[in-house]
Amino acid sequence: GKVNYETYSYFKSLFFSTLYAEEFKYKVIGKLKTDNVIDFPEGGKFVSFHHEGGFETDIGKYGEYQCRGSILYDKNEKLVNMFFACENFDQNGQKFINMGKRFKGSDIDRAVGNMSIIEGEGFWKDYIGYRCTYAVEYVNKVIFAPAQCKNSF
């Protein structure tokens, strides 16, 4: 009857919430390794970047990461497009890939973006499809990027 179903749903939600979190925090601290630039005659530029470092989460996982991507700026230094992929290895050697992009915006928009976990091994299989909103701060060549990730289903 009804009671059994409600009890079942309750335990099911309890069980699944211990398996994986509906949302989690993910933070990287990294260093810019390469930053290759093509300057356009009229002032725009195309930047190819690579940074690497460490990440930590509030779901008990931490490890190392590297990201590669490209950014296109217009002649007023406004972001036109950005596209990147990151490879993450946690403390158990399990890997997940996140990809993101940012579109046209002001200088301020430049520091905020979205990414998604598109592939994962082991533990991370349950997090495929999660969307993360991140903010980026630079101190010289060091990158700080806290993110909030949510189940998008």
Where are these regions (language model features)?
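Bacterial N-terminal signal peptides
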Residues: 9-14
